[in-house]
Amino acid sequence: MIDGEFGGNQDWFTNIVMNIGGCGAATACDSCIYLAKYKGMKELYPFDLEQMDKEAYKKFSQLMKPYIRPRVQGVKKPEWYIGRLEKYISDVNKRCGTDYQIHMEKFDGTGDADEAERIICGQIDKELPVPYLMLRHLNTEKYKDFIWHWFLVVGYEKEKHETWIDVA
């Protein structure tokens, strides 16, 4: 929790570029905070894990910005996100003498829904959040805040023949 919120929010960013297009960096920040707090990879978040607040989160986002920087059309390719987050982790390893290894693999929109559900639910069942880029959705009105947007999938719910994701 960051000042009562689950995860960060790019609306907090005072840097205009990050405020408009920093969802990829915010998702990476949230991922690193989760891994630091719950998976023992404490050096991935260089601030106090017990006293997280918006100011520290904004500072962290500025550290992440050179790795996953906003672009004119956003961080529109998952491999960009993966490669740059791997670079951040590699730099943390070099700087802190750690050896964090995180296997990240792209699953894109060409796969089928059943496979996506299996992958996402499998990661959540392992207590690992899933960075997710939604470029389009058939229901543009209902999901307008998620179109062309990175976010973190942190849970799911199954009801009969449907699975719903919980996001941060």
Residue positions per predicted region:
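Conserved active-site-adjacent core of cysteine acyl-enzyme catalytic domains
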Residues: K58-A168
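Active-site-adjacent structural segments surrounding the nucleophilic cysteine of cysteine proteases
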Residues: M1-R84
